[in-house]
Amino acid sequence: MPASNSCSPPGGDHKPPPPPPSHPSPSPTPSYPPPPNNGGGYYPPPPDNTSHTPPPPSSTPPNNGGGGNDGGSGNTGGGNSDDGSDGGHSICPSGLYSSAQCCSTDVLGIADLNCKPPSRTPKDGSDFAKICSNTGSEARCCVIPVAGQALLCEDVVGAN
């Protein structure tokens, strides 16, 4: 190949390359995690509590001593009931063991079988024991009963 075809002559016409095409600037790439102004990356973003009122305070659940008017025993028309006028005295502590029950079978002092609520609302621990003993059962404070079977229970304070 001849040398005259492979190179431009020195000092001859040499044109600079054309400028690159003009393109719009790309938008900024989002950073991860998202910046704090859009929730800080937690989905969903935290609630805006500035325009909301707080929820009302919770109330204390009722205890086992109130509202005991059970209607009595058949033909007497309510002669043996407690109307709850003693201020709702609680026989069992609030919390897990809060259900007053008369249980006929005790297993190792913690599990009880054949449990039923007392026939009327007891006035105190000794009254609770008397109500249950009338049916041949024992006064116990239990977790919420499930079909009257296999309850976790503890002794009633003041039932002796």
Swiss-Prot record:
Keywords: Cell wall, Disulfide bond, Secreted. One of its GO terms (cellular component) is extracellular region. HBF2-8 is the only class II hydrophobin gene for which no expression has been detected and that does not contain a signal peptide sequence, thus it likely corresponds to a pseudogene. It is found in: Secreted; Secreted, Cell wall. Belongs to the cerato-ulmin hydrophobin family. Induction: No transcription can be detected in the presence of root and stem powder of Shanxin poplar, nor under carbon or nitrogen starvation conditions. This is Class II hydrophobin 8. Gene3D superfamilies: Hydrophobin (3.20.120.10). Aerial growth, conidiation, and dispersal of filamentous fungi in the environment rely upon a capability of their secreting small amphipathic proteins called hydrophobins (HPBs) with low sequence identity. Class I can self-assemble into an outermost layer of rodlet bundles on aerial cell surfaces, conferring cellular hydrophobicity that supports fungal growth, development and dispersal; whereas Class II form highly ordered films at water-air interfaces through intermolecular interactions but contribute nothing to the rodlet structure. It holds the Pfam family Hydrophobin_2. It comes from the Eukaryota. The lineage of its organism: Eukaryota, Fungi, Dikarya, Ascomycota, Pezizomycotina. InterPro entries: Cerato-ulmin_hydrophobin (IPR010636), Hydrophobin_sf (IPR036686). Homodimer. Homodimers further self-assemble to form highly ordered films at water-air interfaces through intermolecular interactions. Disulfide bonds join 92-141, 102-132, 103-115, 142-153.
